[in-house]
Amino acid sequence: MRPLNVQIRLGNLRHNYRILKEMHGGKLLAVVKADAYGHGAVRCAFALADLADGFAVATIDEGIRLRESGITHPIVLLEGVFEASEYEAVEQYSLWPAVGNQWQLEALLSRHWKKPVKVWLKMDSGMHRTGFFPHDYASVYAALKQSEYVDSIVKFSHFSCADEPESGMTEIQMEAFDLGTEGLEGEESLANSAAILNVPEARRDWGRAGLALYGISPFGGSDDRLKPVMRLSTRIFGERVLQPHSPIGYGATFYTSKSTRVGLIACGYADGYPRRAPSNSPVAVDGKLTRVIGRVSMDMMTIELDASQEGLGHEVELWGDTVNINTVAEAAGTIPYELMCNIKRAKFTYIE
């Protein structure tokens, strides 16, 4: 069997939730959209079932999957519905929809609901993707408040630059949010992972923990308070020694500078490892760091082995405990979210 493995350490997931909940205070949503950022939404949700105040997803299908698996917690649809007919499933599965544009609002208010719905009303406080502008927010809130079909309203917005503390954008967005919601009763939600960790003023009634929940610092590098949940590993299935000035891989982008031990490992861009990862991207053989050499292929990669490192059959960590996924993402010119969400053709093992 091809030895590409993903370990999901559910104990680390629980640890991270506790840390983030303690920091935020109040209530905390575990964001499990995109199959829990590639970790497996159902397994992660059940691992957090006795801790989490609720879960957040992006689509109706993601919410239904959690409900049909037995999750009874609040489930927030962060993007709301994509067509009016989806409100039927919102009611059937007791989901909490976000409302972030005029047609979502009108469709919700024009529907005859059998039971009142809890609405997350989104403000565009400066990210300019979705949400009502601050100067329109109070009137939209009033329209929802007057409806017999609306149970309660959570006021929320999303930060564009919370992972860039020096930008000043988070403070600008908080000011816009506070002005736009002034005098409007009800719960609030502002803090994403970066704000939970770094912006105390953004910690309102509900937090939304995404990247940090999976043990990854939104600021790059590592955060000793968090434990990585995903570990991607494979094994060396070929080994050879190349003479100096030997090219390796497609495009002959790397030439050895000396006699070099080369290990061939079972992972490539078809598995989700980024093809853009250059030579010198880190990997670890039995816990000892080394590097990728040559271009990443569809199904395999080549790595450098020094004289002291084990070869054929030995484990190679691509990211996890020794290799920080932020380092791999930075080398490849991408972000850790993309790396985790793209993993496929791997065996997943869940460790309690």
From Swiss-Prot:
Gene3D superfamilies: Alanine racemase (3.20.20.10), Lyase, Ornithine Decarboxylase, Chain A, domain 1 (2.40.37.10). It is an enzyme of class 5 (isomerase). It holds the Pfam family Ala_racemase_N. The active site is at residues 33, 250. Its EC number is 5.1.1.1. One of its GO terms (biological process) is D-alanine biosynthetic process. Keywords: Isomerase, Pyridoxal phosphate. It catalyses: L-alanine = D-alanine. GO terms for molecular function: alanine racemase activity; pyridoxal phosphate binding. The modification N6-(pyridoxal phosphate)lysine is found at residue 33. The keyword Membrane does not apply. Signal peptide: none annotated. HAMAP family: Ala_racemase (MF_01201). Belongs to the alanine racemase family. Catalyzes the interconversion of L-alanine and D-alanine. May also act on other amino acids. This is Alanine racemase.
